[in-house]
Amino acid sequence: IAVSRRDIGDAQVGDCVAVEVTSYGDDTYHPQGVVSAALGENGTMEASIAAILHENGVFDVFPDEVLKQADAIPQQVDLASAGKRLDLRDKLIFTIDGDDAKDFDDAVSLEKLDNGHYLLGVHIADVSHYVTPDSPLDSEAFRRGTSVYFPGHVVPMLPFALSNGICSLNPNVDRLAFSALMEMDASGRRYGARFSKSIIRSKARMTYNKVNKILAGDKGLREEYAFLVETAEKMNDLAHALYKRRIERGALELDIPEAEIRVDEAGKPVEICFRERGESEKLIEEFMLQANEAVA
């Protein structure tokens, strides 16, 4: 495609660009076009990601009206406008995510009841409190549909002020959530469930790696997180019971290895390996399944 010098915009020699065809030419002329976007120096990680996003209609930049609405949302919970909610801030609730996770949208809890049963809690960030129907944020989230993840890079469905801020269940701060509270015995049998808008305060930002090491007996981590070790062990026991019950019911288990692309500090891929799936990953999987089954 031939592009005139006057139609290259801000692009530089060696850049990766997107070109809009203005004429497809004929037997004697090449197609003609104009540079519609300069995506960065060709061959770099940034340009490669930008090209994939552009090709698939995914936009890294949010419209001004969306950012304006997001920036106007306070980064602290306003109890006066939160409405009637179940106050769970004194409960031992914590998140478990990957080492590189920046947004924490779910948390878990487990407590022993007087009748010997357990109360399993799955707490999901209440984004709907901040993203109201037909607002600019709502329309943009609907248009995007999902967050798009690359190794070392994410294009969020919602601006970072929400996804990494007030809608992220960060530790030691109040957050609005929607909680599924399920009563079950040690064998994983569920006796009932209730659902409520809630306010929580996560007590720790845990990672799969740390919880796996705690469950494996890592002395240093067990001392550092002594306040949740017993709960983590009981969670693991319950997760095993839930898995056993699920398999006995005829669940189809597709334990397919997941590839993990590791990048260096510059964001360049340096290794492709199988993602390890330890006890904590399975624990979260079982608890989320329980919450979904209870809701259904």
Residue ranges and their predicted role:
Residues 1-121, 128-173, 212:
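Charge-lined substrate channels and their catalytic hotspots, especially those that engage the 3′ end
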Residues 1-5, 23, 37, 220-225, ...:
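Short hinge/gating elements
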Residues 50, 64-68, 86-89, 192-196, ...:
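Short coil/turn segments at secondary-structure boundaries
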Residues 112-114, 184-189, 263-267:
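Short acidic-glycine loop/turn motifs at beta-strand connectors
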Residues 118-131, 282-293:
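Conserved phosphate/anionic-ligand binding catalytic regions in large, soluble enzymes, centered on
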Residues 147-248:
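Conserved catalytic alpha/beta cores of large enzymes that bind or transform nucleotide phosphates
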Residues 227-241, 277-294:
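Conserved pre-motif C helix in the palm subdomain of viral-like polymerases
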Residues 246-270, 286-294:
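Core structural elements
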